[in-house]
Design a protein with these regions (language model features):
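Short N-terminal helix-initiation segments at or just after the protein's N-terminus
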Residues: 14-28, 53-59, 147-160, 235-236
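Conserved SAM-binding loop
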Residues: 49-149, 159, 164, 211
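A conditional alpha-helix N-cap/helix-loop micro-motif detector
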Residues: 31-35, 90, 156
Length: 245
């Protein structure tokens, strides 16, 4: 059997399995805990008095909407991204937010599907702490399980306890809430004993975290001077140059 025919048959089997498993899918994910967590954060912003909000990863890549639309009535809203583009107010690296903004500039900082693309996410947590006001909040939505994307700048996946590894007393935070959502299953394509029952274990495609700044991060115990350019000559891909997959 030729490789081309085998590939076509494999695709047929996968499409058939996808249809058979369709009955396990929820009709909509709007009430999923992952989405409810952002609704909770959104309400925190909307009831605050004249909040200053920073969105990390504001460039219009696929959502085709302005993040400002999520927070009607918020006038002090800044969108930052590593590349210039639509809805981007400031071009800056999340690993170097302290160079782009003054200390204690924002009441709220949030990012959606960004932290998996940060080479040094612990450094980003330190930078967020620096530009947040005391008592300010950060919201992070990212993935415990997801297909690789925006290659080669796709580095990390996060589980429930990852929240505390990034946002803790040393980095100057306390975790207010964390939840995983968007349930999924994985089907192994190898017959290894350790993997053949992978489909029986539930995993999640989304994790949402809310953390509060309770202090400045511990500068005596924490220091990270490297930036991505120190260890790679690649850049986060633009749509025109993004590799397939």
């Amino acid at each position: 059997m030729s490789a081309r025919i085998r590939t076509a048959l494999d695709q047929l089997v996968l499409r058939t399995a996808n249809r058979l498993l369709g009955r396990l899918r929820r009709a909509k994910s709007g009430d999923d805990p992952y989405h409810r967590m952002f609704a909770q954060f959104r309400q925190m912003v909307l009831v605050a008095e004249n909040p200053a909000v920073l969105e990390i990863g504001a460039r219009n890549v696929s959502a085709n909407h302005d993040g400002r639309d999520r927070f009607p009535g918020v006038s002090d809203y800044t969108g930052v991204d590593i590349h210039p583009g639509q809805y981007v107010d400031v071009v800056a690296d999340a690993h170097q937010l302290g160079k782009a903004f003054p200390e204690k500039r924002f009441d709220f900082v949030y990012s959606i599907s960004v932290f998996e693309h940060l080479m040094f996410p612990w450094k980003a947590a330190m930078e967020i702490n620096e530009i947040l006001k005391p008592g300010g909040h950060v919201f992070v939505a990212t993935h415990p399980a997801w297909a690789s994307h925006e290659l080669p700048w796709d580095f990390w996946r996060y589980l429930h306890h990852s929240a505390h590894s990034l946002f803790n007393s040393v980095t100057g935070f306390e975790v207010v809430a964390v939840t995983e959502g968007l349930p999924a299953r994985m089907f192994s394509l190898v017959r290894d004993p350790a993997a053949q029952y992978m489909h029986l274990f539930q995993m999640h495609q989304g994790i949402a975290i809310i953390a509060k700044k309770v202090s400045n991060y511990d500068r005596e115990r924490l220091r990270w001077d490297l930036v991505p350019a120190d260890v790679t000559d690649t850049l986060y891909p633009l749509p025109a140059t993004k590799p397939a997959g």
